[in-house]
Amino acid sequence: MMEDKEMQILKDRIRKDGKIREGNVLKVDSFLNHQMDVSLFREIGKEFKRRFEGEEITKILTIEASGIGIAEVFNVPVVFAKKTQTKNIAGDVYTTQVESYTHGRIYDIIVSREFLGPDDKVLLIDDFMANGKAMEGLIQIVKDSGAQLVGAGIVIEKGFQPGGDALRDQGVHLESLAIVESMDEKTGEIVFR
């Protein structure tokens, strides 16, 4: 399969610094989801901006905290679903449960109703997608709020897992910047779609 040349900088970085772990886990915490490479985030943000050009977006919704830096380029408010209820978030909230593929557990995500409503046009942003459970949770929150879902941007999609295809089958405008077709823990080889 011919590899897409867009976002080559991201794919090169995944190949250079990504580490494949047991259970089809791709560890990219040195530049994406623990320590953030701000110049790479800027390029990722610009690419999402290009791919969703012409769409009216009033809010970005992500799960804390990986999508926050990426969303900055859109110049609209970024709402992030919290993984734990805090005293700061009291009163009316949207909440749903999501299953984390990487962490192998289910957790609640919470968004205050104050920040998401029927007038919003929402773009979802997340760093990773495997089975798509986090995206399904965010989509449910958008539906519960009465807002309009514009689309979803994923930095790294595991194309060999069902999440991306399931969302596309539901008609979601999904843009994944790097789709991993396969990865080999023994050789360290990562093949992109």
Regions found by a protein language model. Name each.
Residues 2-57:
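Active-site-facing substrate-recognition patch
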Residues 57-64:
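Short glycine-rich phosphate-binding loop at a beta-alpha junction
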Residues 58, 120, 150:
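Conserved acidic residues
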Residues 69-75:
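Short Gly/Thr/Asp-enriched flexible loops that form oxyanion-binding sites at enzyme active sites
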Residues 76-122, 188-192:
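Short, glycine/charge-rich flexible loops or terminal/linker lids adjacent to PRPP-binding catalytic cores
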Residues 118, 126-144:
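Active-site/ligand-binding-proximal alpha/beta "capping" segment
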Residues 139-193:
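PRPP-dependent phosphoribosyltransferase catalytic core
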